[in-house]
């Protein structure tokens, strides 16, 4: 009778998302309305500002170059980034987003803290994988993580100190902040690296919290042609409702309007590779498959069934490069057709 946790789960299950796409209106009209609502929920856009872009270091690493830089995404807030650029003709850009880890250096396969090696062995050296797959790689440090916010042992502030919660008091969300940084990073790379990087065909990818930001950024920005979120796309009622997750996963009010599979339909005019681990305890396979089926139905309606892929890895909460990258590479070009 007095089980409040069970009650909120039941309430979630019986709440039909009010903006679910039902096919009764043109897809483009629904997408416009849905994106406007999602933008409101994420508290976007933020106020524009000068990018104050600055190169911090530049290195020739043989087959590729590395440019470390930062830029201003909001007045007085700077975003650290690294851009890895293969030699030769401009390659498609892959945006690589770390989840709850010690920072973006993991994407380059660099060990700085205890436990980093385990993260890298879990397939999280995204930038190096992207280079091998034929992309340029942009690494963006997530707010409240790594050099943008961590403890002495490298632990992200959003997980240990709930540092992302004050954003809610200002009507903001951590996801919205991170999405904004990704969108502004695309602006910066498109402006200053246009001759060295192909930004007409952008892929965005990440695992766990990085997958979540990949997902929402791809919902919001059509410049991202292929989204590859890993261990993050799963119906809310099967993941962040019944199980404990970091506060940075939550967007106030979102479940009244959308489930995660509904939001995935915002990408049904582009391409989506959902990656999951069949033994992932945080994002159970059943909930992942619900999201996938809902999204794929709209992709099919749009004549793009082949542009919505579910990659099932054989283990738990990690990335699966051998299974995922071949699908992403195919869709990087399919997304343009």
Spans of model-derived segments:
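C-terminal catalytic histidine-bearing segment of alpha/beta-hydrolase fold enzymes
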Residues: 293, 299-337
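Cap/lid segment of the alpha/beta-hydrolase catalytic domain
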Residues: 97-180, 191-192, 239-241
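Glycine-rich nucleophile elbow surrounding the catalytic serine of serine-hydrolase chemistry
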Residues: 206-216
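N-terminal targeting or regulatory segments adjacent to alpha/beta-hydrolase or S9 domains
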Residues: 1-65, 337
């Amino acid at each position: 009778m007095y089980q409040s946790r069970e009650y909120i789960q039941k309430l979630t299950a019986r709440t039909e998302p009010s903006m679910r796409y039902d096919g009764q209106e043109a897809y483009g009209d629904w997408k416009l309305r849905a994106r406007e609502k999602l933008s409101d929920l994420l508290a976007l856009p933020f106020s524009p500002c000068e990018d104050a872009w600055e190169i911090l270091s530049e290195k020739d690493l043989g087959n590729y170059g590395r440019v470390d830089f930062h830029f201003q995404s909001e007045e007085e807030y700077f975003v650290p980034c690294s851009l890895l650029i293969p030699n030769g003709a401009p390659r498609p850009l892959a945006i690589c987003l770390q989840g709850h880890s010690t920072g973006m250096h993991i994407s380059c396969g660099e060990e700085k803290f205890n436990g980093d090696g385990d993260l890298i062995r879990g397939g999280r050296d995204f930038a190096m994988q992207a280079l091998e797959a034929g992309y340029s790689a942009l690494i963006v440090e997530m707010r409240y993580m790594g050099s943008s916010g961590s403890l002495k042992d490298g632990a992200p502030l959003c997980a240990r100190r709930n540092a992302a919660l004050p954003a809610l008091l200002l009507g903001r969300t951590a996801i919205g902040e991170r999405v904004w940084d990704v969108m502004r990073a695309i602006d910066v790379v498109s402006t200053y690296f246009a001759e060295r990087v192909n930004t007409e065909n952008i892929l965005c990818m990440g695992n766990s919290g990085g997958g979540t930001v990949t997902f929402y950024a791809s919902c919001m920005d059509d410049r991202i042609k292929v989204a590859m979120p890993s261990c993050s796309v799963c119906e809310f009622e099967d993941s962040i409702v019944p199980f404990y997750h970091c506060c940075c996963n939550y967007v106030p009010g979102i479940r009244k309007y959308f489930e995660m599979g509904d939001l995935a339909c915002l990408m049904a005019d582009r391409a989506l590779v959902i990656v999951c681990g069949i033994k992932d305890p945080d994002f159970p396979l059943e909930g992942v498959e619900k999201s996938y089926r809902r999204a794929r139905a709209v992709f099919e309606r749009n004549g793009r069934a082949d542009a919505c892929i579910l990659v099932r890895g054989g283990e738990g909460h990690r990335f699966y490069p051998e299974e995922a990258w071949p699908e992403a590479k195919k869709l990087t070009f399919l997304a343009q057709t």
